[in-house]
């Protein structure tokens, strides 16, 4: 939603007012934003730009999340972005940084599993190990999407392009998380090369099957707190349902 929460300046007040009015009108299930920045010195960049995860950045972003939540009248969800280059200057691990933001602000976390896979491949770490450390209780929604290879670098650089089917590796990570954490509302993103409607519904059916198959594992561990029923949405060029975020 272009809030640029990791930027050096506060979220644009006029934009927040317009977003709040839109939320009142359409009553979205969730409002989300990436852990990234996209505006500087009055200029907007149509991208999700990285930053150094320092303690100073933690204070600044927590304050910006608080401002956004106050303006919107609700907690928002913060999404893990995709990473393409190793960024110098980090003082915080990404998962610890996200968890601390949630602790300070009351926000929830939006887990984009395609971003997990893309980042792990690009930076050379284990997506499974990263996912297993993610704070399950803080996840309010999951995103699935397809990715592409960089035209010049090929498999050595994956792009979170939302223009392809969800990859087998991403489905495997999704099953891994659901088996451990239980069902979560899930959104499948598709913004380019949109296929026939039947193909989109097939992916929806795959996600629903994963949620159904994964849910009993959690229920067997904690029968007094059954998991919520599966919720699947698709969002993008063939959107239906309500979502604010990306």
Please state what every model-predicted region is.
Residues 231-233:
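Charged/polar low-complexity intrinsically disordered segments
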Residues 9-10, 48-52, 58, 119-181:
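Gly/Pro-rich active-site loop or hairpin
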Residues 12-109:
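Active-site acidic/histidine proton-transfer and metal-coordination neighborhood
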Residues 31, 112, 142, 186:
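Conserved, mostly hydrophobic/aromatic
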Residues 1-16:
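Glycine/small-residue-rich interface belts in oligomeric ring/scaffold proteins
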Residues 197-216:
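C-terminal helical cap(s) of enzyme catalytic domains, especially alpha/beta-barrels
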Residues 1-4, 35-36, 81-83, 114-118, ...:
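Active-site beta-loop-alpha junctions enriched in small/polar residues
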């Amino acid at each position: 939603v272009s809030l640029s929460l990791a930027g050096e300046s506060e979220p644009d007040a006029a934009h927040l007012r317009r977003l709040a009015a839109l939320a009142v009108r359409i009553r979205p299930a969730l409002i989300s934003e990436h852990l990234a920045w996209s505006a500087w010195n009055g200029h907007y960049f149509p991208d999700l730009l990285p930053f150094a995860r320092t303690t100073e950045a933690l204070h600044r972003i927590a304050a910006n999340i608080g401002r956004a939540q106050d303006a919107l009248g609700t907690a928002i969800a913060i999404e893990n972005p995709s990473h393409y280059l190793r960024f110098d200057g980090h003082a915080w691990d990404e998962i610890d940084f996200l968890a601390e933001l949630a602790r300070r602000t009351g926000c929830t976390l939006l887990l984009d599993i395609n971003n997990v896979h893309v980042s792990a491949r690009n930076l050379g770490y284990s997506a499974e190990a990263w996912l297993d450390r993610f704070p399950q209780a803080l996840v309010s929604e999951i995103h699935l999407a397809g990715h592409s290879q960089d035209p010049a670098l090929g498999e050595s650089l994956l792009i979170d392009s939302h223009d392809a089917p969800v990859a087998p590796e991403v489905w495997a990570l999704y099953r891994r998380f659901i088996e451990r954490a239980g069902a979560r509302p899930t959104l499948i993103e598709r913004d380019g090369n949109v296929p026939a409607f039947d193909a989109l519904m097939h992916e929806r059916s795959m996600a629903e099957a994963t949620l159904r198959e994964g849910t009993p594992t959690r229920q067997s561990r904690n029968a007094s707190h059954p998991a919520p029923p599966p919720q699947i949405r698709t969002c993008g060029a063939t959107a239906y349902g309500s979502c604010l975020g990306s």
